[in-house]
Amino acid sequence: MLRVAVPNKGALSESAITMLTEAGYRQRRSSRELVLVDNDNGVEFFYLRPRDIAIYVGGGTLDLGITGRDLLLDSGAEAAEELCLDFARSTFRLAGPLGQFSSVQDLQGKRIATSYQVLLERHLAEQGVDAEVVRLDGAVESSIRLGVADAIADVVETGNTLRAAGLEIFDEPIMTSEALLIRRGDEPEPEGLSVLRRRLQGVLVARQYVMMDYDIREELLPAATEITPGMEGPTISPLGRDGAVAVRSMVRKADTNKVMDALYEVGARAILVSPIQAARI
């Protein structure tokens, strides 16, 4: 049975559980459940601290896990990225009091608080900056006011929390992060991984694309199919009246209205859009 680690709290947890549910896997109904066995799909899910997941997977205790790239790299675990999951996007940034710092070089001899000690120390070494790293488990934005640090390094999504604490981001992002499916890099592919990966890829496609249908005259078809080429070409079916066809094609969800406008301009009519519930590409 495939053994998979899932974050047990926070935004990573909610989005991971939603994605696994959309992929057809049973998920826990209560935060008190630590383990859930999905016998129908041959998967055992373990709900763990996001920061610990890479360690369990890298150590071979569990086959797979869902965690952030930031947590994976900071852990130093022997686990590798298997699939990007397109949620929990963030950046690892430096921040400090307004107007005090402009680059990482300004941190020479300073104290920097972070929950990501490995990532920060690696970055400082690469930049040739000698600074004291103060490791905290959370709420690092309060460390400057409390006199523990001069600056911080933290994962940022919107930056609202930092601004509320009177801090500003400076210098370039240290790294970008998002949610990942990970596995131990030097192990053979575990049984069941290919199905899980294919299902998650199907969820990503279903979230990113819609199905677009429209009617058009045959002589106008080349211009229309140039707008909607689909993945491997559109599906074209004759209609009941001479010279008209129905076209079906996958379109990126973000481009829906722009594509509909372009189709209308070249003569397409009865343009309809339907969501994709699941996909295998």
From Swiss-Prot:
Function, in words: Catalyzes the condensation of ATP and 5-phosphoribose 1-diphosphate to form N'-(5'-phosphoribosyl)-ATP (PR-ATP). Has a crucial role in the pathway because the rate of histidine biosynthesis seems to be controlled primarily by regulation of HisG enzymatic activity.
Give the subcellular location. Answer: Cytoplasm
Chief location category: cytoplasm
How is the activity of this chain controlled? Feedback inhibited by histidine.
Q: Which cofactor does it need?
A: Mg(2+)
Recorded E.C. number(s)? 2.4.2.17
Similarity-based family? Belongs to the ATP phosphoribosyltransferase family. Long subfamily.
Species source reads Kocuria rhizophila (strain ATCC 9341 / DSM 348 / NBRC 103217 / DC2201)
Recorded GO cellular component terms are: cytoplasm
Question: Got any disulfides in this one, which pairs?
Answer: none
Question: Which pathway does this chain act in?
Answer: Amino-acid biosynthesis; L-histidine biosynthesis; L-histidine from 5-phospho-alpha-D-ribose 1-diphosphate: step 1/9
Q: Under what name is this protein listed? A: ATP phosphoribosyltransferase
Which biological process, per GO, is one annotated for this protein? L-histidine biosynthetic process
Reaction(s) catalysed (UniProt annotation): 1-(5-phospho-beta-D-ribosyl)-ATP + diphosphate = 5-phospho-alpha-D-ribose 1-diphosphate + ATP
InterPro entries according to UniProt: ATP-PRT_HisG_long, ATP_PRibTrfase_cat, ATP_PRibTrfase_CS, ATP_PRibTrfase_HisG, HisG_C, N-reg_PII-like_a/b, N-reg_PII/ATP_PRibTrfase_C
Sorted alphabetically, the keyword list is: Amino-acid biosynthesis, ATP-binding, Cytoplasm, Glycosyltransferase, Histidine biosynthesis, Magnesium, Metal-binding, Nucleotide-binding, Transferase
GO terms (molecular function) for this protein are: ATP binding; ATP phosphoribosyltransferase activity; magnesium ion binding
- A Pfam entry, by short name: HisG_C
